[in-house]
Design a protein with these regions (language model features):
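Helical scaffold of the NTase/Pol beta-like nucleotidyltransferase catalytic core
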Residues: 1-5
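Short hydrophobic/aromatic segments of transmembrane alpha-helices and their interfaces
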Residues: 6-7, 56
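Catalytic metal-binding acidic patch
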Residues: 8-49
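Short loop/turn segments at secondary-structure transitions that flank enzyme active sites
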Residues: 29-32, 69-72, 116, 142-143
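A basic- and aromatic-enriched beta-loop-alpha substructure that forms the phosphate/nucleotide-
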Residues: 36-115
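Conserved nucleotidyltransferase catalytic core and NTase-mimicking acidic/glycine-rich helix/loop elements
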Residues: 91-222
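Acidic, carboxylate-rich catalytic segments that either coordinate divalent cations
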Residues: 215-251
Length: 252
């Protein structure tokens, strides 16, 4: 398990006093586990214990989803809260992700994620769960960041950093600071009215993004698929060496 991080509000920077610990991890199977005609499960889901929610993906799954434009693994790699892991793995994987991630696909991911939160949870805006406001606000800020950084595809995960780098209007900054201050002292299910400033920012960024990211997009190139395979093999081989395995294809 070369990487385990916090993926929820504690890493985003807007946790509540009773927020869960959302631990997510990447695991890599031994070389010998690949020499079989049977497909191994690519997800590990642990039972919820208290305020700890933990599950992880096989590196193979993480790479496949990355090449399809899923932003989840990109965010894991940028989490500011690392529970355990190996620095070289995170650094190398993040470098590969920067090259492999499709701006268009990542943009569509954030747009669809944010629009769903807006559509399902905002209602008339008089009483909205605070965390749902952030669940739409964060994708909107990520879309703005992508628009302002036309050569980048990997936005900051940490929300205060994301907001600072996307240079929002001053009235929005004040509203966001107030929201974060309130959420920091309110239980996870606390509610708040949706301000016009926040709603306007969210709707504006989604509207702008529709014109940029709603196209069908292009899948990963053959060259990038080959590079993903090379990266995967390199990780498996290095972990085998570091574990002291002499014959990686001999069962334990």
């Amino acid at each position: 398990m070369p990487l385990a991080i916090e993926s929820g509000s504690r890493a985003w920077g807007f946790s509540s006093p009773d927020s869960d610990y959302d631990c997510r991890f990447v695991f890599v199977r031994r070389a010998v586990d690949h020499v079989t005609p049977w497909t191994s499960r690519d997800v590990i889901e642990l039972s919820l214990e208290g305020d700890l929610d933990a599950n992880g993906w096989d590196l193979r799954k993480a790479l496949q989803l990355l090449l399809k434009g899923n932003a989840v693994i990109v965010e894991w790699l940028r989490s500011p809260v690392i529970y355990c892991g190996q620095a070289w793995f995170r650094d190398d994987f993040l470098e590969f992700a920067r090259q492999a991630a499709s701006r268009e696909a990542i943009g569509r991911h954030y747009l669809h994620l944010g629009e769903r939160q807006r559509r399902v949870y905002f209602g008339d805006g008089t009483s909205v769960a605070q965390k749902k406001i952030f669940y739409a606000l964060r994708p909107a800020a990520a879309l703005r960041w992508l628009r302002m950084h036309p050569t980048e595809a990997v936005a900051p995960m940490h929300f205060p950093t994301l907001m600072a780098e996307c240079e929002p209007p001053s009235d929005l900054r004040a509203e966001v600071v107030d929201l974060m201050d309130r959420k920091a002292v309110t239980r996870e299910l606390g509610v708040a009215p949706l301000s016009r400033v926040v709603a306007g920012f969210i709707d504006s960024e989604f509207e702008l993004a529709r014109g940029v990211f709603e196209g069908g997009g292009v899948g990963a190139s053959e060259q990038m698929i080959l590079r993903a395979e090379q990266f995967y093999r390199g990780v498996v081989e290095r972990l085998e060496r570091e574990s002291g395995t002499i014959d990686p294809f001999r069962p334990a």
